[in-house]
Amino acid sequence: MKSMDGLWQMTKFRPYALIVLAVLVVFARAVGFSYIGLDDAGYTFRNPFVATGFSWANVVECFTNFRHGGIWMPFTYITYMIDMDVSRITGMQLSAWMHLVNVLLHVLNAILLLYLARRIASAMGRDGSPWLVLVAALFWAIHPMRVEPVAWIACRKEMLWVLFTLCGLAFWLKYLTASVRNATAKTSLILAFICCVAACLCKPSAMCFPVLAGAFHLLLRSGASEDVRKPGFSAQAIACYIAMFVVAGGTAIAAAYSQTHVAGQEAVALFAAPFHHRVVHALSALGFYFWAAVWPSGLHVDFRMVEGILPQDGAANLIAFAVAAMVAVLAVVYMWRKKSPGAISACLFSFAWFLVPIAPTLGLFGSFGIEAHADRFTYLPAMAIVFLAALCRMPDIAVKRFSDGALFKTVLVVVAVYGGFAFRQAGFWRDDYTAHLRALDCDPGHPRAMVHVGDALCARVKDFDRGIAFYRKSLALRPREYVKYRLAYALASRGGWEDRQEVKRLGAEVVRNPSLDQRGMMLDALGTVYMAEGDWETAIKMFKASIAAPGRFWPKGATKRKLDECIERIR
């Protein structure tokens, strides 16, 4: 039998081809998926500076509008603009094209991750098994926790900022390992900085870029083999660090403002939650991420926190698991330190790679991020396992068995099982109804998921009885004005006498002050009720106010037809 290392050397493209094939097998089905109600529409076809496609006016707006959607990500919005234009030109369904772009971005990131891990191992003078690195990259690429960022159009920002981060760090590594500071090295430095800026413009999470660049620098200085050249801190490198930290600081300010001054909502405090709640959330979220990496069960959209800002799955258990996992890793590193030179520096680097980009999402540095954790937040941090595999030397017996193929095949089967779970998990993201029905299966008391399921039942299958039941249950658990308006619209559509009376009770304040309904849904419901009762003048007033509502996001055709009918009746 040929050794696995021999097969690796047969062609340098074989590992990358295997990565591409695995990702496409698991995620290609996402191209046929529809939209998810959370953010997909608000970022794309209902976004006023995206829906009309690419134009300089729209580009200026996406750079200067810091409040839309609670996040500043101009480069990501520009890609959505291009999506709109491509869909119009080619006639391809918009959702299909957007999902295709997401899948291709994930393919690119998986390729770049494998490339970067091999490059850093080579730069460090490590001779570990390349097949172990490949298996780790496969594990990352097709793990069930990758489903959310790949199958959710709104998560384009995750893959874009990671794409530019990986590219930038590859250029940074090329600069650090250059033997001569010539024009090529300077070009690599400039490209690394450009990628840093681009990543920050895709999502503010990229503010961690200079810290990751510094981690690469320190790793090469402290953990490389003795015969490997150690990069110093040249004036060029220091200037680049300063520039990157300035960009990161500006991005952090923009992120804080966007999260606390969301368009259409009242401004909120940056540190609204008590510090001890933020600490509990951070530790329990880490526990969940560690647990889900091993046992990815119960993953779903919009994971919520229950009253008191504690995780649904129990803070104590998750915190205990997080602490136990970190202690176990430290114990293994301590025992392995003599058999694997550089193990400590490799583990410290991998730990920094995991913790630095995920820290802003944990809620410690501000209350945004305190209400939930999400699989998408681990998209870049989880790559730490690939770098750990590349930088740590395996025991000789494990290397031999990997080379013979026995251990490799066993591990590959395990990775394939995770890929199978990811394929199944992707099926829960077909559309908004399926995604939130899955959320209710995992968390039966999820009030926002009830609203989304109710929307689908009323709009798609006209099952108003079940849809209204979901709205009522959501209101009982968490009263919200927008849910009350949806309930009124569904009641008006069902059209019973008792339904009409309830709509008038629910919308009494809106009748007196129509400006309270920014989206026009309650106004439309009231107009429908007054129309059914023959009060044409009041119905006309309600329909006109509904059509003119500044935050209306749904089609106006049906409302206009009802308005025309009322006007015709008066004549």
Q: How would you label these PLM feature ranges?
A:
Residues K2-A459, D463-A490, G495:
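Polytopic membrane enzymes that build or remodel cell-surface glycoconjugates and lipids
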Residues C442, L477, N513-S515, A549:
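Structural marker of alpha-solenoid helical repeat scaffolds
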Residues P447-R448, E481-V483, D517-M521, F553-W554:
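Helix-start (N-cap) detector for alpha-helical repeat units in TPR-like alpha-solenoids
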Residues M450-L457, F470, K484-L491, L506, ...:
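TPR/Sel1-like alpha-solenoid repeat signature
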Residues G467-F470, D499-R512:
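Alpha-helical repeat scaffolds
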Residues L475-A476, I540-G551:
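TPR/TPR-like (Sel1-like) alpha-helical repeat modules
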Residues P550-R571:
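Terminal, low-structured helical/coil segments at or just beyond the last alpha-helical repeat
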